[in-house]
Amino acid sequence: MKTLEELDACYRAMPPVAAMGIESAGWDGQRLRLRAPLAANINDKGTVFGGSMASIATLAAWGLLTLRLGAEGIKAEVYVADSQLRYLKPLVADLGAEAWLDEGTDWDAFLRSYRERGRARAQLLARVTDPEGATVAEFSGRFAALRAP
């Protein structure tokens, strides 16, 4: 995948993600932003469901790595290996997410590993935001890229 249109089509093809109304909101080659409506992600308390926060953060990081690989001409299978999410406060509005590579991830070494061994791992970060851009949750995840069959 190389474009936001392709990424959005991929998200729409996954029934749980489509139900959440997640769509891309921006991509600058380094950071990916997503958004989703409160109405599709509301819980019994009238706030965003915690699982929706975890999902949009994971999908932002997954999408970022997928797009960065696509920009390198690489079609890989990307998987989340493990992740952590810290909830900072409830959200009673539409949600957003922004993902980027952790500063400790050496992109050139990642690409070298993938090209030589057919697999590589990267640490990604994301934040879940309110409509004004304030952070309501912080995500950290380790992702694996495997050579596509």
What feature does the model see in each segment?
Residues 36-38, 87, 101, 145:
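Hydrophobic residues in beta-strands and at strand termini
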Residues 37-62, 74-77:
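Hot-dog-fold acyl-thioester-processing enzymes
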Residues 91-92, 102-149:
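HotDog/MaoC-like acyl-thioester-processing domains
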Residues 34, 81-83, 97, 122-124, ...:
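Hydrophobic residues positioned within well-ordered beta-strands of beta-sheet architectures
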Residues 16, 30, 77-79, 93, ...:
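Residue-level preference for beta-strand/loop junctions
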Residues 18-22, 81-87, 109-111:
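Short structured motifs
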Residues 64-105:
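Hydrophobic beta-strand-centered segment that forms part of the acyl-chain substrate-binding groove
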Residues 1-35, 39-40, 74:
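Non-catalytic linker/capping segments at the edges of enzyme domains
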